[in-house]
């Protein structure tokens, strides 16, 4: 498993414990006490490092090559998944996957960004950066879900929508804007979960919902820290400083009222235990569906509208203003 710079002391100690256990198996010597001491030390070290992570550490975890993807969670959370392809206008976009499935026996529509696990798959899926046809495919599935009264679950994990010439020629901005407009008025429940990077309009194209949740180490921002640093200071190398200033973590966005709940992760990130992470998401989905139960279609749209109107409202003394 790939290690990140900030967690090297933890990885080194884990390896040392593993080596000592392997040596014990092949020798007559008993190192159980030494192993116990090292395991206690490891527990304290993990608590110290993972309990005091900086924003840049979380950015690295959100981008981890082995971090679970939309298809990983579909495999663990849903049954009878049937993937649908194409936008019926131009083609299919592998950077967004979607289809119908069952969650606890309930028919649902599941849509999400999909990046690759290796170079070949990343190229096929364009590193999880969708073209317009990806967003139009997603919208087609959302309108289908509305027609058949199926709740929608969206998994968000992208650096952003693809900014290439062909994408712009096919109407990238219109496709995202159309999704924002249509998602705001859907008459079925929409639950959005940021599972990795939530990058700019590319994330928002799947991100208008009744409830917005984030995994503990995911990020959500208008631009990458590198991009912000390049614009503000003409130096992408200042990405760490930009990340601190941008308030892009789940804790920051919960405090600001942009998201609803934070889904806990295993120490070191979701990639450490995909099954456990799926269970944590499952708990949040069950809780969210309970909160949505019994809400009429009109009330659903009204609450969704009120939710987004509150974002950006701040108070100075007793005066309330809107940030335009």
Curated annotation (Swiss-Prot):
UniProt cross-references to SUPFAM superfamilies, sorted A to Z: ClpP/crotonase
TM annotation in the entry: none
GO molecular function: acetyl-CoA carboxylase activity; ATP binding; carboxyl- or carbamoyltransferase activity
Any Pfam family: ACCA
Domain CoA carboxyltransferase C-terminal: 37-291
One Gene Ontology cellular component: acetyl-CoA carboxylase complex
Keywords recorded for this protein, A-Z: ATP-binding, Cytoplasm, Fatty acid biosynthesis, Fatty acid metabolism, Lipid biosynthesis, Lipid metabolism, Nucleotide-binding, Transferase
Catalytic function, reaction form: N(6)-carboxybiotinyl-L-lysyl-[protein] + acetyl-CoA = N(6)-biotinyl-L-lysyl-[protein] + malonyl-CoA
Pathway per the UniProt entry: Lipid metabolism; malonyl-CoA biosynthesis; malonyl-CoA from acetyl-CoA: step 1/1
Presence of the UniProt keyword Amino-acid biosynthesis in the record: no
EC number per UniProt: 2.1.3.15
One GO biological process term: malonyl-CoA biosynthetic process
Subcellular location per the Swiss-Prot or TrEMBL entry: Cytoplasm
HAMAP family found in the cross-reference section: AcetylCoA_CT_alpha
Family classification: Belongs to the AccA family.
Subunit structure: Acetyl-CoA carboxylase is a heterohexamer composed of biotin carboxyl carrier protein (AccB), biotin carboxylase (AccC) and two subunits each of ACCase subunit alpha (AccA) and ACCase subunit beta (AccD).
Functional description taken from the UniProt entry: Component of the acetyl coenzyme A carboxylase (ACC) complex. First, biotin carboxylase catalyzes the carboxylation of biotin on its carrier protein (BCCP) and then the CO(2) group is transferred by the carboxyltransferase to acetyl-CoA to form malonyl-CoA.
Protein name as catalogued: Acetyl-coenzyme A carboxylase carboxyl transferase subunit alpha
Gene expressing this chain: accA
């Amino acid at each position: 498993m790939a290690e990140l710079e900030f967690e090297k002391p933890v990885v080194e100690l884990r390896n040392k414990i593993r080596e000592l256990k392997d040596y014990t198996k092949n020798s007559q010597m008993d190192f159980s006490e030494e192993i116990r001491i090292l395991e206690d030390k490891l527990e304290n070290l993990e608590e110290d490092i993972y309990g005091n992570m900086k924003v840049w550490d979380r950015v690295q975890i959100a981008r981890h090559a082995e971090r679970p993807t939309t298809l990983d969670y579909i495999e663990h959370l849903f049954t009878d998944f049937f993937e649908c392809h194409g936008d019926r206008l131009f083609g299919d976009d592998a950077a967004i996957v979607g289809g119908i499935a069952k969650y606890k026996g309930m028919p649902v529509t599941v849509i999400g960004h999909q990046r690759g696990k290796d170079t070949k798959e990343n190229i096929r899926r364009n590193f999880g950066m969708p073209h317009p046809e990806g967003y139009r495919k997603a919208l087609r599935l959302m309108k289908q879900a509305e027609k058949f009264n199926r709740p929608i679950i969206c998994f968000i994990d992208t650096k952003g929508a693809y900014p290439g010439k062909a994408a712009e020629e096919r109407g990238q901005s219109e496709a995202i804007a159309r999704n924002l407009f249509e998602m705001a008025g859907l008459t079925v429940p929409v639950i959005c979960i940021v599972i990795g990077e939530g990058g700019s309009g590319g994330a928002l194209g799947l991100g208008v919902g009744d409830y917005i949740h984030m995994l503990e180490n995911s990020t959500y921002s208008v631009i990458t820290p590198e991009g912000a640093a390049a614009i503000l200071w003409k130096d992408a190398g200042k990405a760490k400083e930009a990340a601190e200033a941008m308030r892009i973590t789940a804790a920051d966005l919960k405090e600001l009222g942009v998201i609803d709940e934070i889904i806990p992760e295993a120490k070191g990130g979701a990639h450490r235990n995909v099954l456990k992470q799926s269970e944590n998401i499952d708990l949040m989905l069950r809780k969210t569906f309970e909160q949505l139960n019994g809400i009429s279609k009109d009330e659903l749209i009204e609450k969704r509208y009120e939710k987004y109107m509150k974002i950006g409202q701040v108070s100075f003394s007793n005066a309330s203003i809107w940030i335009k």
